Amino acid sequence: DKTVFQVASCNDKDFQNLMHVYLDAVFYPNIYKEEKIFKQEGWHYHLDSVDGPLTYNGVVFNEMKGVFSSPEQLIERKIQQSLYPDTGYGFESGGDPVDIPNLTYGDYLDFHSKYYHPSNSYIYLYGDMDMEEKLTWIDEKYLSHFEYLKVDSEIKPQKAFDNPAEEDDYYSLAEGDSEKDKSYISYNAVTGNSLDRDLYIAFQVLNYVLIQGVGAPVKQALVDAGIGSEIISFFEESICQPFFSIIAKNTEVSKKEEFVKIIREELEKLVKEGINKDSLNAGLNALEFRYREADFGSYPKGLMYGLQMFDSWLYDSEKPFIHISANDTFKRLREKMEDGYFESLIQTYLLDNTHRSIVTAAPKTGLTAEQDRAEAEKCRKYFDTLSQEEKENLVRETEELTRYQEEPTPKEDLEKIPLLSREDIGKKALPFSNIEKDVKGTKVLHHDYFTNGIYYIDLYFDIKPLLAEYAPYISLLTSLIGCVDTDAHDKLAFSNEILQNAGDFTFDTLLSRKYKQPKEYKAFMIFRAKVFEEKTEKVFELLDEALKTSHLEDEKRLKEIVSENASALYMRLISAGHSTAVNRALSYGSRMGKYDEAMNGISYYRFLKQLNDHFDEYKENTIVILKMLMQEIFTKDKMMAGITCAKDAYDGFEKAFVKFAEKMPEKPEEDGNIQPQISFDDMHQNEGFKTAGQVQYVARSGNFVERGVPYHGSYRVVRAMLSYGFLWNEVRVKGGAYGVMCGFPSSGDGYFVSYRDPKLAETN
């Protein structure tokens, strides 16, 4: 329901330049002057010879083929179509590849001129700047040059249904894959409107309580009944009428009635008996921690605040801040929790509500080939209707487009782009704090930064000696700790304890090369926690409980986690095909690359699939190895700590850490040397992996440091020049790929990769 163009910079002149470039691109695009832009970026007929064949090509056309190749994208798209058939939400914003060739250049310009007009825009500024000066500049340079245009862009709500809807569809499965247990089933409900402040957060809490939390009751009931290998859910709050979905993956459509029956029975039970208050508190605490912390990772905080504002501003111009000012909302929800508020939401929106749907997506082997044939036949039929002159015109237009794409941008146009001078760029780097301490024999790295009362704790445990035999088992172990029963808590209670005391409590692996020594690397399992200072000791107590008393021998729970991880990893590998290809290519060149891939990539997926498919055969050996790894890894002699907090807060961390470390075993009780039944072998170089997708991801890699080319900071400039110069023109502009990337990090692991690419051999 919106298109967002965003810029951010820490440099005021750069920010001003970017505003100029973006506002010019949005309000004065060259699409009105040059139809070839539409052909290149949207779609066009491609004809090299009057003898054929005629094909479609275009960047967005190929991008959307990639989008439509994902079964999860399909089910999400069908959910919205089922719930909002009479509104814009019932359509694919990027366009269906089957329908994109029906879009004419004229219709495209009409749509743009109507909706992409200043009268229909929302402009948002955030940061340390002279707001009056910026707003005056925007008005004088852009807004004042347009006459007011009355635009009816109101988001009309979907009228509620008299009866729930049902929709069934198919997605493509790769040739040779079994269709057994590969279907999706979803239970979906519209949940009020986005201007209800309490609902907005309450359903995010219910998302955790019902499905996403470890041992969540609805999810557990579905898992226990064998409905799917993975149960997921999401709450889409960023549209006019939010909706909540529960999805079973890797199931059978024949289980649809049982799926719905179990969900409704569990929801009715929760309404009747009441929701676990610890679970509600855990969900509220987790959301409130994230809200107060306001850490958006690599995304600028101001950008994320702006995007959240649109969750209300777009639907009521007088309410832009209702969701980014939420202290009162959290307070209200804690009070309402005691009065059955969350139970009433379940009854109203998930049980009694008729504005809901059941959607299924079943696999169909060969559907991609069927779609490709239909597309080719459509092009052939159109080609057969053309006269000789029309064919010659298409050949000429194809040649003209190619020449247009190959022509360098005129110098006078390049000189219009506002640039920074060297004097505009500050030479002073941001300060880096890395204070090394020895705390009773353990190395501690203190990063002295203001963190607003939060400790960011990292514990590093050396795993390098274990990788050769146990790499995939180590990765599996990171998914188990904190997600299984302990001596003192079942998995649900333990998960609630974590979220009531910490903002983060996770395990992961990290492999890192030594600077300028590409063959040398370190490998760690990392425990990460975010915690308010006053709860640090409690979090260390929970960590001690998890490391020493986790019930890894619970075969049922182990099978659940293996199955869930295999399903989730498969989709991640497919949807992020560019990352999958790069990591696989890098695995050929070094032991570190091989082990990293064995813990995160295709090799790890194959390990999980083999363990899942033959669980009874491998479970005992796997459990023995996991227990051995717990003893081998989590010892004092393998531990290093990192803490990020202000200097005056450090002592509180050290006090709690020392108490925890004193209870850690110095070394493993006994040498672990258990032969794994599932091994991972060296990979063959130059591989191809077949999927049901209609586009490719093509990668090449190699280590330039090992070949005698030392790393230099200028390679960051080279990366930008290649990505937006040669590679952009050859792979995206001419080739039709949606994206192309490259990287030259200090480790020397260089790579090139395309994204949603219709070509393979040409790109390679």
Language-model segments: residues:
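Hydrophobic, small-residue-rich alpha-helical packing segments that form membrane-like cores
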Residues: 45-120, 124-175, 179-181, 186
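M16 family metallopeptidases and their MPP-like homologs
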Residues: 1-28, 35-47, 73-98, 120-126, ...
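Core subunits and conserved enzymes of cellular information-processing
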Residues: 346-349
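Non-catalytic, conformational "gating/processing" segments within enzyme and secreted inhibitor domains
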Residues: 57, 106-141, 596, 600-601, ...
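Extended, regular secondary-structure scaffolds
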Residues: 110, 122, 131-152, 273, ...
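His/Glu-based metal-binding/catalytic segments typifying zinc-dependent metallopeptidases
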Residues: 61-73, 151-215, 300-319, 323, ...
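Short beta-strand/turn micro-motifs at beta-sheet edges
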Residues: 110-112, 172-176, 231-236, 445-447, ...
